[in-house]
Structure formats: C-alpha cells, structure tokens
C-alpha cells in the first residue's frame, strides 16, 4: 500500500496504521530490541497515575501502553483513530475507543491526566493536538508525552541516524506486514523537533511546568507538563 507522507494527512496515516496493526507490537519489539517495554514503564512512572484517577492514553494503538498504565489502579481509557490498531488490541482487557486526536470524543475537563506515546509526531498540527488534550484534562491535570527525540551524544546520533534510514526499513521488511510504513516512521523521526523545541511547543499550547527527561541517550524523551488551574 502507499505509505503516509510527512504531510500527515489523517486518512493516509490511519490507513497506514490499519495495515500494520496485526504485527505492530511484534515489529516494535524487534526494531527496538525490546527496549520499548522499558519506555512504557518509564512513561507510567513519569505520569504517576493514582488509583481511582481517570487517565486518557492517546494514540493508544493496540492498547499495550494502556495496559501498562492500568497497572497503577487508575481508570485508563485508550483512544486511537486507527480502527485496525484498535481491532488488533481487542484481546486486552482495557477500554479502547476510536477518536481523532484533534477532535477528541470526550467532554471538557474529564481526565486527571493524559499521555501520548509515539503518536504526537503523527498529528498534522502538533500545537492544536496539545490544545485539544488540554481541553479534556482537568485544571491542574498532568500530561506526559513519550516520543522519539534527538540523541544527545554526537557519535551515537550518527549511528542512530544510519540505523533509522538503512537498518530499520530492512528489518521491517522481515517482520512487518507493511514495511513501507516504517520508511515514514524513519522520516518522521528525523523531521521531529528536538527536546527543547518540543518543550516550547508544549508551553505555547497552554501547558505549564514543562520539562523533559531523556531515555536511551535521547533516542526517546519524556516531556511532562501541567494544565494551569
């Protein structure tokens, strides 16, 4: 199938994820060497959901991140606009709903906290997506964004870039049901802003107390923020 482009047209992105849903989790584990499990645990720790809190997990895909967050005892709802991904996650005992990140199917001030892992990069309008997340989070509520970022060690950065553009698509051909989608993945990661720039975007979207923590040498960064009271 035709892969999505960096124009990030919603229908193209949704079709792309629909196509990779069945093998998405397996492919990610292979491509990351299993580190994706540690990233999910770090995201849960950073967000720090409490028992009884309502949390929305955006770009939840197959619900693997939703299941991890649910270990906290919070009521976690996964939301994604790819029906194929949601279908692939039906076996998980977590609530999953269909919804567009730019027009979420939730009322204002519904959630105590929100998280989005490896999904903000796919929004056509990053700032608009962050404002929409703020709409559904209660005043004083928390946000954690887990996303690919910029390695902080120059030599490591060079090796990582080579992996993205050469090795990643090659490995994807072996394990993925739609390897072309991983060409988009590599391109979108390279085009994504670095840690400091993303922090400014989050702040400009109305969030406060914005900060970040690097994981795996900056391959991934966890940005956190709070909605003003």
UniProtKB/Swiss-Prot annotation:
It catalyses: a 2-demethylmenaquinol + S-adenosyl-L-methionine = a menaquinol + S-adenosyl-L-homocysteine + H(+). S-adenosyl-L-methionine binds at residues 62, 80, 100-101, 117. One of its GO terms (molecular function) is demethylmenaquinone methyltransferase activity. The keyword Transferase applies. One of its GO terms (biological process) is methylation. Pfam families: Ubie_methyltran. Transmembrane segments: none annotated. Keywords: Menaquinone biosynthesis, Methyltransferase, S-adenosyl-L-methionine, Transferase. Its EC number is 2.1.1.163. It is an enzyme of class 2 (transferase). Pathway: Quinol/quinone metabolism; menaquinone biosynthesis; menaquinol from 1,4-dihydroxy-2-naphthoate: step 2/2. HAMAP family: MenG_UbiE_methyltr. Belongs to the class I-like SAM-binding methyltransferase superfamily. MenG/UbiE family. PANTHER family: 2-METHOXY-6-POLYPRENYL-1,4-BENZOQUINOL METHYLASE, MITOCHONDRIAL, METHYLTRANSFERASE. Methyltransferase required for the conversion of demethylmenaquinol (DMKH2) to menaquinol (MKH2). This is Demethylmenaquinone methyltransferase. It comes from Corynebacterium kroppenstedtii (strain DSM 44385 / JCM 11950 / CIP 105744 / CCUG 35717).
